[in-house]
Design a protein with these regions (language model features):
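Hydrophobic pocket/interface hotspot
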Residues: 43, 58-60, 66-67, 78, ...
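Bacterial N-terminal signal peptides that target proteins for export
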Residues: 1-9
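Bacterial N-terminal signal peptides
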Residues: 8-17
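A short hydrophobic beta-strand element
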Residues: 108-120
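Short, low-complexity N-terminal intrinsically disordered segments enriched in polar/charged residues
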Residues: 19-61, 172-182
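A solvent-exposed, acidic/Ser-Thr-rich amphipathic alpha-helical stretch
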Residues: 56-107
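Exposed beta-sheet edge and beta->alpha loop/turn motif
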Residues: 117-146
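Low-complexity, intrinsically disordered terminal/linker segments enriched in charged
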Residues: 150-182
Length: 182
């Protein structure tokens, strides 16, 4: 009888603790993962809307007030500076296509692998229109703070970009794996 009571007590305790939910550490990991998924969804949404032509999406709802875009000419700080920086893609290119090929993250960091295509029909960061097609892939490192974009830094092959925009005719190397023709 005592053995049976011990068994029932043991089973009751096992059942009680197994139903109590995740530990504090497990819950923190679940919360962090849920926040990351929410941040990734927001990030993709913002850039899809922007490249659909809704430049008003670059605002303080999605970007921190002191958002930073790191460039080789110095950091750009603030929502308006970021919006003006990315507007160069609209001013410099027609038939623009921006694709987020992949995006993933960990904690408050996101990595975006992207592709940009367009026809160079306007001034692009001081490079006059050439009429050339651009097909450029790159990666962006992103920091998120309190559910908002707080920092971006793009990495791409600048030589490929310049070759494509300044080439007068013939073959252009888009990247090491693909050939483009003007």
């Amino acid at each position: 009888m005592i053995h049976r009571l011990k068994t029932i007590l043991f089973m009751s305790l096992v059942l009680l603790f197994s139903c109590s939910g995740p530990s504090k550490e497990q819950q923190e990991k679940l919360d962090t993962q849920a926040q990351l998924e929410k941040d990734l969804e927001m990030y993709k949404y913002v850039w899809e809307r922007f490249f659909e032509g809704d430049t008003s999406i670059v605002n303080d709802k999605y970007f921190t007030e002191d958002v930073v875009v790191v460039t080789d000419q110095g950091d750009l700080v603030g929502v308006e500076a970021v919006k003006n920086f990315y507007l160069n893609y609209f001013l410099g290119f027609s038939d623009a296509e921006f694709t987020i090929v992949d995006a993933f993250g960990q904690g408050d960091k996101i990595v975006k692998y992207w592709n940009f295509k367009g026809v160079h029909t306007g001034d692009f960061f001081g490079i006059p229109a050439s009429g050339n097609k651009l097909d450029l892939s790159g990666t962006t490192l992103v920091s998120i703070k309190d559910g908002k974009i707080s920092r971006e830094q793009d990495f791409f092959d600048m030589m490929s970009l310049l070759n494509q925009l300044q080439q007068t005719s013939g073959d252009v190397t888009v990247d090491a794996q693909n050939q483009g023709v003007l």
